[in-house]
């Protein structure tokens, strides 16, 4: 692997947490948001990693809770003219790329992603230019500019299948930006994969030793791990997968106790899927006192009720997502390739069932 970016030496400035709201204030903002959604002909889409009360509000108002791609696809089929995207900035960009005719609003445009931040377009373009014989595959957690530089965009749910497909064609791969997911995909497929060295600040904190100690306390529990986690943690898992795949695994695994190594925001939908099971947070490196993310993305936490109400009410430069037309056209090519591949994959799976 070619180390261009050492996430261990990169300390991202975390945003301030939203100010705590009283019960009355929360009720006020929930009511205000519902009114604004109706007035603006808007629908709310929220990521699995946002706070539970935000996910609940999205569902209550006819929106959806999903991963970044499904959020954008939901918006493209919904009649609303405005999408309120509760997530991080690249998710708003993806929604705009797939829905250029719609207004895309976010609670804040300052909600970042360490994978996006860790893959700046200028450095990444130089890296790609240095390896012109390789097919460029980038994760959805990237900027519109990085997507436009890529041949393919991919989500974790179909990453293994896509790399297997490209490998069968004899193609060598550049993978960006997550080194752990890239390592996992390479190990699963045996493909020639050159990885950019980014990492998710949440999943990178899960460590084997702490997880082993927790397993001793809960010997009958199954371990569920997102592949953005370090390889040693992934190797301990009973199930490895994307957010939606982990929720499905929680439903189907026979164990009644589940240790979950991903952002704790997923517990809202996971508990809905298996209310009879006990969900346990996998320990992060610091096990509380010294952890940085503590298993919850600090930028996802910026999507509070007050910020959502402000985004719907104010709009404008502080809340609306714009993507340059040429950049959008460039990013749409690898995104559509992924969507077409995913559709054909579902057809093949259905045909083999």
UniProtKB/Swiss-Prot annotation:
Cofactor-binding details, from the entry: Binds 1 [4Fe-4S] cluster per subunit.
Membrane spanning stretches: none
GO molecular function: 4 iron, 4 sulfur cluster binding; metal ion binding; quinolinate synthetase A activity
Binding annotation for iminosuccinate: 47, 68, 139-141, 156, 226-228, 243
Keyword annotations from UniProtKB, A to Z: 4Fe-4S, Cytoplasm, Iron, Iron-sulfur, Metal-binding, Pyridine nucleotide biosynthesis, Transferase
Cofactor(s), by name: [4Fe-4S] cluster
Binding-site list for [4Fe-4S] cluster: 113, 200, 297
Secreted keyword on record: no
EC id: 2.5.1.72
One term under GO cellular component: cytosol
Position of the signal peptide: none
Role description: Catalyzes the condensation of iminoaspartate with dihydroxyacetone phosphate to form quinolinate.
NCBIfam families in the record: nadA, PRK09375.1-1, PRK09375.1-2
Family, as annotated: Belongs to the quinolinate synthase family. Type 1 subfamily.
PANTHER family per the UniProt record, alphabetical: QUINOLINATE SYNTHASE, CHLOROPLASTIC, QUINOLINATE SYNTHETASE A
Protein name as catalogued: Quinolinate synthase
Organism, as annotated: Pectobacterium atrosepticum (strain SCRI 1043 / ATCC BAA-672) (Erwinia carotovora subsp. atroseptica)
Gene: nadA
């Amino acid at each position: 692997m070619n180390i261009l970016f050492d996430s261990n030496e990169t300390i991202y400035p975390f945003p301030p947490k939203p100010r705590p709201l009283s019960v009355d204030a929360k009720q006020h903002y929930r009511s205000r948001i519902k009114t604004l959604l109706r007035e603006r002909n808007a629908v709310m889409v929220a990521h699995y990693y946002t706070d539970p009360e935000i996910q609940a509000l999205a569902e209550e108002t006819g929106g959806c809770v999903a991963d970044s791609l499904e959020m954008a696809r939901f918006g493209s089929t919904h009649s609303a003219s405005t999408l309120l995207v509760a997530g991080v900035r690249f998710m708003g960009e993806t929604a705009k790329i797939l829905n250029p005719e719609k207004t895309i609003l976010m609670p804040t445009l300052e909600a970042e992603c360490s994978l996006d931040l860790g893959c700046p377009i200028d450095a990444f373009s130089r890296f790609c230019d240095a390896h012109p014989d390789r097919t460029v595959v980038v994760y959805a957690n990237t900027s519109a500019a990085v997507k436009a530089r890529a041949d393919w965009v991919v989500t974790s749910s179909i990453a293994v299948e896509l790399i297997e497909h490209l490998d069968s064609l004899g193609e060598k791969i550049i993978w960006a930006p997550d080194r752990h997911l890239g390592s996992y995909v390479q190990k699963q497929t045996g493909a020639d994969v050159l990885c950019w060295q980014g990492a998710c600040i949440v999943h990178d904190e899960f460590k084997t030793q702490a997880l082993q100690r927790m397993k001793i306390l809960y010997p009958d529990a199954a371990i569920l791990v997102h592949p953005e986690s370090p390889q040693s943690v992934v190797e301990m898992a009973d199930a490895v997968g994307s957010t939606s795949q982990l929720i499905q695994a929680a439903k189907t695994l026979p164990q009644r106790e589940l240790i979950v190594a991903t952002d704790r925001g997923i517990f809202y939908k996971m508990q809905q899927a298996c209310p009879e099971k006990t969900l346990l947070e996998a320990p992060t490196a610091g096990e509380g006192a010294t952890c940085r993310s503590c298993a919850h993305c600090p930028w996802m936490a910026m999507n509070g009720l007050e910020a959502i109400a402000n985004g719907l009410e104010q709009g404008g430069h502080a809340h609306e997502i714009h993507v340059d037309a040429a950049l959008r056209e460039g990013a749409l090519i690898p995104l559509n390739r992924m969507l077409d591949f995913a559709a054909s994959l579902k057809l093949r799976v259905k045909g083999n069932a």
